[in-house]
Amino acid sequence: MKVALFTETYLPYINGVVTHVKILKEGLEKLGHDVLIVTADTNAKRHYVRDGILHCPATSFKRFYDYGLATPVSSTRLKLVKRFNPDIIHIHNEFGVGFSGAMIAKILKVPLVYTLHTMYDDYLYYVAPRPFIPIVKKTSRKYARFLANKANALTGPSKKVEEYFHSCGVYKDVNVIPNPVELDIFLPHNIDEEKKNAFRGKYGISENTMLVCFCGRLGREKSVDVLFKYWAKRVKPADDMKLLIIGGGPSEEELKKLAVELGIQDMVIFTGKVDHKELPPYYASCDLYITASLSDTNSISMLEAMATGLPVLHRYDPLNEGQVKNGINGYIYHDDAEMYNYLVMMKNQTPEEKERFRQSVRDSVNQAGCENLANYLITVYTKAYEKALEKKEKETV
């Protein structure tokens, strides 16, 4: 099967969508399928294809992590995609490249699959001042409905996506397909032991200190401020716990100031932006992963930490239930008291209990590799392709 994957962001950018698309491409190719990535590129002066990637000229969007935005209409893009002759077009974003994917699918009469990765209601402050957010929210939902109605199949990494589509007035079936993780990179036995040991030394963290990490873009939607407030309310220096914040973003300086205001600056370490390939020893040096975010659908950073064996402490989110199971791969907390109780409980586990828990966590994600993701989606693609073929045959009768 020939599959064109349309995504506004791709390598060298790193985010959940990029990782998902990269792993999907690898999985599809391992199974013998042909893949074309269509993406925005702020360095491209013209459309060109290289190494299976169609680069589309784009403008940098400063307010949204400097990602590129391509124009939605391009006859050159249409010509190059037509030359690839896809059986399926699969869009992963809703902006210029995603919209053009939907339009090209219609022009070429190719089935369209649409994956919603992002809860845009949580990101509107990037594009609109507060007084305009209700209007932008309404417009954003209308646009999501428009794209969903164009698609032959919808997918998303959690039930949260289904609920979002319902709120937009879309009641089609949503194929819930959990996000993937690059298992080979994050499995503990593949992580450089020297780098792992050097990490704690670099930050002056003793072996006895419980190191709790969060990894992600530091934007308001990640609720790191909530995590800091919970931490400040309960955790004391005598508890011998430190919070490692891995990543950078627009809220980084604001969060550093908040840590000082809350008096927890000596318990919080900011690493700044870290290259994705350098992440494994960071996770491997930690004892557990924590998040207060309610905007994620199925956090890839969390899954990567789990592949390393880190139990997850996740703030309660009814639409993401089942991703973290108490005592299996982590614990769900509802408030600061519950968060603290779990921290203390896990700090007091014996080495044997910790290792058993880590193995249980790793087991919970061992089916999240590239080929499993590709197989899930090939099933979706095949159904969409067969239905489209059936419809075409009826129209010609």
Predicted feature descriptions by range:
Residues 41, 160, 180:
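Carbohydrate-associated surface elements
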Residues 1-45, 49-55, 382, 389, ...:
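N-terminal subdomain of nucleotide-sugar transferases
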Residues 311-314:
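Short hydrophobic beta-strand element within catalytic cores of glycosyltransferases
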Residues 206-231:
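Conserved donor-binding/catalytic core segment of Leloir-type glycosyltransferases
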